[in-house]
Amino acid sequence: MQPLELYIHIPFCVKKCAYCDFLSGPAGEKEKEEYVKMLVDEIRNCPDTVQNYRVISIFFGGGTPSLLTGEQIGRLMDTVREIFTLDEDAEITMEMNPGTVTEEKLRKYRQAGVNRLSIGLQSVNDEELRLLGRIHTYEEFREAYHLARANGFSNINVDLISAIPGQTVESWRRTLEQVMALSPEHISAYSLILEEGTTFYKKYVEDEAKEGPKLPDEDAERQMYWDTETLMEKNGYHRYEISNYAKEGYACRHNLGYWERIPYLGFGIGAASLVPGDLIGKCRKLEGKMSRYTNPDQLSEYAHSYRNKFQAELLTETEEMEEFMFLGLRKMNGISKKEFSEYFGKSLEDIYGEPICKLESLKLLEQDDDRVWLTKRGIDVSNSVFVEFLLEE
């Protein structure tokens, strides 16, 4: 049976954070329950061909999935088991906001099968948390973290954000050091991105932030980036992707599957799917082997459309090749030349020989007989590197 991943989107949050451009917002208990019922219906509407696949990971993302009750998460997991073949050791992750954690929820999430938590901390500095619009303090995060440990969670990720307004190199180091002292199995460390439509974008891009804390300058941001890798490696966290670090054996399997282009089904509003033609019951065209579908981002449209989920758009071979490179090169071990040729029936050198030679001469890429990967310098300018792998249609 071929591997498959599931993503379940929970679009609810207590309030929108200043940097967040994800599909999320506040909702009442009645709305949450109605949404869970729609998710159950959508999962049950999957075609029989999903039985040809085994689910290796499930990710509850948001929003704030931990706003759902243990019973609601249990119902969703029961439905997944009813429709899909779930690996015994499947990785089942739930994103969690420290301000929404209770012991009862944690206990019931564990009973439902959740075996990995991703806790959104972002900073240990309460003033930085306030600026971000977070609903919790650092102490509340610590309480939630220890409560999760006490309830049997032995695989925990902590999300962090650098380059926050008013943040200094020293305060970022304190965040890293204090989080590593807690010894989570995994740490995701992202640099703040000002996304259009967010509170931060309006303040720092459109209004140019005439008052209040300023964004760190480029030198400070770069130092934070370098300090992250240095301190993580020193404390036993291996960098396996541009923004992700893990102790040995604790790399996020769901994320690795995404970067390695394992098929995935997304459930809920705005959720994306990437599926092979045989899963959706359609004959594959000559160009492209995978299809993409994104659910509507409006609840009213989603409620009436998910039954037609599998009317998907076939990716062209060009799009697939570009994704193969963009996603694979995010991993520290890069991409496999053999896997490229086996999947596309063409050698990597024939398609990308010129940009690879150019980037190698600039010391942005390295390669051996089978693999191509980013150098440390290439990681620093990864977006510029990825542009080189765009193909003309």
Which sequence ranges carry the predicted segments?
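Minor-groove-contacting beta-hairpin "wing" of winged helix-turn-helix DNA-binding domains
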Residues: 371-375
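Short amphipathic alpha-helical interaction segments
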Residues: 346-358
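Short, amphipathic alpha-helical interaction segments positioned at domain boundaries
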Residues: 377-393
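C-terminal scaffold of the Radical SAM
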Residues: 3, 24-46, 53-346
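A short, conserved structural fragment
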Residues: 360-370
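Immediate flanking context of iron-sulfur cluster ligation sites
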Residues: 2-10
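Local cysteine-cluster metal-coordination motifs and their immediate loop/turn environment
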Residues: 11-22
